Design a protein with these regions (language model features):
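Active-site-proximal loop/helix segments of hydrolase catalytic cores
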Residues: 324, 384-481
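Active-site environment of divalent metal-dependent phosphoester hydrolases
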Residues: 291, 317-321, 343-346, 367-372, ...
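Active-site HxH/HxHxD metal-binding segment of metal-dependent hydrolases
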Residues: 299-366
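Pre-active-site segment of Zn-dependent metallo-hydrolases
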Residues: 6-212, 243-259, 267, 273-316, ...
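Metallo-beta-lactamase
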Residues: 234-259, 341-405, 517-540
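Active-site-proximal beta-strand elements of phosphoester/diester hydrolases
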Residues: 263-266, 281-286, 377-384, 406-412
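Short acidic, glycine/proline-enriched helix-loop-strand junctions
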Residues: 456-471, 477-478, 482, 492-540
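Active-site neighborhood of phospho(di)ester-bond hydrolases with catalytic His/Asp-centered motifs
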Residues: 283-286, 307-321, 336-341, 408-413, ...
């Protein structure tokens, strides 16, 4: 897409410009970093009150305690607002804004929680039909009361209908635009992005075309005056936004080439680009870094192909579905492939969420569902664990065939039942290359799902139901079952640009790092090529 107003250098008073490579466009929901649970109506409604308001009110009550906790590395990732005491007034204003702007969502969330408590108390195995009359008004018509086959009461939501209701609130969607100061950011789950003199506020919902305009502006120059007009920049913010822009020629986006070979590139964490011999490509769990000064080598957005045939998502956690990167890629993506969901409160639809933020072509695949395109095959495989034993079905490991090479992207799959991988070997054959995580010391499940629970979980039980992936022993069984000849440990959250959403301790003496090292060594002892990935990698087969 060439610039519409002539070549670089024309019009010195109105030059052609692009975004600087360190400019962050961070999507926000009522000032909180936007992750999928803050877009989907049910989870957004419950998080507004039971996560956001709860932690903000705690900060206002004891700001010094929060400041002290945030200075302790062992407490990173905890419910502590990483703001100075001087921000108490601004936080009080955010509390009032949240209560006003998200009032209908909070009302729905309270009604949903009340409905759950009601059926837990009153549904005793007899017909559940009389309980519909007791449902609070905000949820009537949006929920179905059921029993599980084991006789336990449950509640399901009509999620498509909720996107047409007040529980879905586009008006609280916006973005903060600023220049990155290295890779460090406050922990996104507990600290809102407050306004500041170096931040430009973009008051547009995520489905707005302005996000595509900004994404293109990273690669295709436009007149400076057009950029200021497109962003509706007032005279008092012109200098700030101008600092986001550069006249330096941008990196050129290149198409995937027909090389006759398979190439894969690791972009950090669980993000891997696969290019098939005929040039068909897919991008797994896109989380792409900005230009950084941390010393960690990295690929950036301009290293991706000009067109991305398939974006494939493994599961609905913030470090695998990063809306910030997805919006930066939206204009380049043909199709997004996601695991089909189950429709429970803890399992919002990835397809509906992505469609609501402007993605037109989203395909859901059930287990063993397959897409074939040229020399690339993508198949959904079962993904056990890592969700605190909740009935979450929006998760898949992905089997990929690129030319004659087979791969499995297992992400955070926990090998709870090794027989599964024996069965998968029969279903898909030997897997040449295994990508598997070793995050075997995850947080208690309430860390992510606590705001969704109708009643608080017992702490001892919570500690046993962790968001764990496989450890070395379990991972080694996967390797043996699938007959893999290459093994790559990934999805460890160790890259510095992941810390603001994972809060994972990147040191080498942790249980995940130890298990990753043990798996690599065990594989190498068996003559299997093995490596723990970090930062970037580029492999042609």
């Amino acid at each position: 897409m060439p610039p519409s107003n002539g070549p670089l250098g024309v019009g010195m008073d109105d030059p052609l410009v692009t975004l600087k490579t360190d400019v962050v466009i961070e999507p926000l929901v009522e000032r909180w970093h936007a992750w999928a649970h803050l877009v989907s109506p049910v989870t957004s409604s419950l998080n507004a009150k039971y996560r956001h308001l709860a932690v903000l009110e705690s900060f206002v009550t004891a700001p010094s305690a929060h400041v002290s906790a945030c200075q302790n590395p062992k407490l990173r990732g905890g419910p502590f607002v990483d703001l100075p005491v001087s921000e108490v007034g601004a936080v009080k204003a955010l509390i009032e804004s949240t209560k006003a702007r998200q009032a209908k969502q909070i009302e729905f969330g309270d009604a949903l929680r009340e409905s759950f408590r009601m059926i837990m108390k009153q549904a005793d195995g007899f017909s559940i039909e009389p309980l519909y009359e007791q449902l609070p008004e905000p949820v009537k018509g949006y929920v179905e009361l059921t029993y599980t086959i084991g006789g336990y009461p449950d509640l399901r939501v009509n999620e498509p209908l909720l996107y047409l209701s007040p529980a879905y609130n586009r008006s609280v969607q916006s973005a903060a635009i600023y220049r990155a100061q290295g890779d460090d950011r406050p922990f996104a789950f507990s600290t809102p992005k407050m306004p500041g003199p170096n931040i430009f506020e973009l008051e547009e919902p995520f489905d707005s075309q302005v996000y595509d305009y900004l994404a293109r502006l990273r690669h295709y120059p436009q007149r400076r005056s057009e950029v200021l007009a497109a962003l509706k920049v007032g005279s008092d913010r012109t200098d700030l936004v101008s600092d986001f822009l550069t006249e330096a020629p941008p990196a050129t986006l290149k198409p995937s080439e027909k090389t006759g070979k398979t190439r894969w590139r690791y972009f950090g964490h669980a993000c891997v680009l696969v290019e098939a011999p005929d040039g068909t490509n897919m991008l797994m769990d896109p989380v792409v870094a900005y230009e950084g000064k941390s010393g960690v080598e990295r690929f950036v957005l301009s290293d991706l192909p000009e067109r991305i045939d398939y974006v494939v998502l493994t599961h609905n956690h913030a470090d695998h579905v990063l809306i910030e990167t997805l919006l930066a890629l939206r204009f380049r993506v043909d199709t997004i492939v996601v695991p089909a969901g189950g429709g429970s409160v803890a399992d919002p639809s990835l397809k509906l969420m992505l469609q609501s933020i402007g993605f037109k072509n989203v395909i859901e695949l059930d287990s063993l569902g397959t897409i074939e395109s040229g020399e690339l095959t993508i198949k959904a495989l079962p993904f056990l664990g890592e969700h605190g034993d909740l009935d979450v079905r929006s998760k898949a490991a992905w089997f990929v065939r690129s030319g004659e090479t087979t791969m499995l992207f297992a992400a955070d799959s926990n090998n709870l039942d090794p027989v599964l991988y024996d069965l998968l070997r029969k279903a898909v054959g030997r897997v040449d290359i295994l990508f598997i995580g070793m995050e075997c010391a995850g947080a208690p499940f309430s860390w992510t799902y606590g705001p969704l629970l109708p009643v608080a979980v017992d702490r001892k039980k919570d500690q046993t139901r962790r968001l764990n992936g496989s450890d070395c022993e379990k991972g080694l069984k996967v390797v043996k079952s699938l007959g893999s000849t290459e093994v790559y440990v990934y999805a460890m959250g160790a890259e510095p640009w992941l810390q603001f959403i994972t809060s994972i301790d990147p040191s080498e003496d942790t249980a995940p790092a130890t298990n990753a090292r043990q798996l690599v060594e065990a594989c190498q002892t068996m003559g299997i090529k093995a490596l723990r990935l970090f930062g970037k990698a580029d492999v042609t087969i």
